[in-house]
Design a protein with these regions (language model features):
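Cytochrome P450
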Residues: 1-222
């Protein structure tokens, strides 16, 4: 989102390569459909362009957000031991740990939009074709909506959280993410590695996709 032509060119090359691989599979799936995401969309009547876009979204959403959310939620629980204690005491669950992290740190911090017509909000007029950025990270720390917006607190109500968007733009992968992270990754990590502890500083990076760059840990082998 910084307008770097080299980054843009690299991204365009990558998406074009994915499109070529998709196009190579389409004829085969037209005669021999299967249960793949690509085939299901074709059978549902989506256009080739829509199918390509959705496949690329699934590839991106299936690696960036889970990576950041798993590493970030693990760091949050190791850093805030009193919150992890709520899970071991069974007063709260792994889904609480994941959803509160997604609110507090917002693995998807921003989503771009294009204004289709002149629009006025308060005393600000947005002209048609203007580019705007919807800030999930800001909305998820709204002091008017959350009791302790800047704290990682499993006991906090998350009814107003927009970590997965809202309305017609609600994330199609939300339930898959909850299952992958809260039912598999986090409980497995803490069960398989008892005594896991942080052993260094953790830096976060990213804007649209935000998460820890590294999470150095120590695990005492018993």
């Amino acid at each position: 989102y910084q307008g770097d032509p080299k980054v843009t060119a690299r991204c365009n090359d990558c998406t074009a390569s994915i499109d070529r691989h998709i196009d190579a599979r389409l004829p085969e799936l037209q005669t021999a459909p299967d249960k793949s995401l690509l085939s299901v969309q074709m059978q549902a009547g989506l256009s080739d362009a829509q199918t390509r876009a959705n496949i690329k979204l699934a590839i991106s959403g299936g690696q960036n957000e889970p990576r950041d959310a798993i590493a970030g939620a693990a760091w949050a629980l190791l850093h805030h031991r009193e919150q992890y204690a709520k899970i071991t005491a069974r007063t709260h669950t792994w889904i609480d740990a994941f959803e509160e992290y997604a609110r507090w740190m917002s693995p998807i911090g921003m989503s771009p939009r294009r204004i289709t017509q002149d629009y006025t909000i308060g005393d600000i007029t947005l002209p048609a074709n203007a580019r705007v950025f919807f800030m999930f990270g800001s909305g998820n720390r709204d002091a008017a909506a959350f009791d302790t917006p800047d704290q990682y607190n499993l006991s906090q109500s998350r009814a107003a959280a927009i970590s997965f968007g809202a309305g017609p733009h609600f994330c199609a992968g939300a339930w898959a993410a909850r299952c992958l992270i809260a039912e598999v990754a986090l409980p497995m990590l803490f069960d398989r590695l008892p005594g896991l502890a942080l052993c260094g500083d953790v830096a976060f990076g990213g804007w649209a996709f935000r998460g820890p760059l590294t999470v150095p840990v120590h695990w005492p082998v018993r």
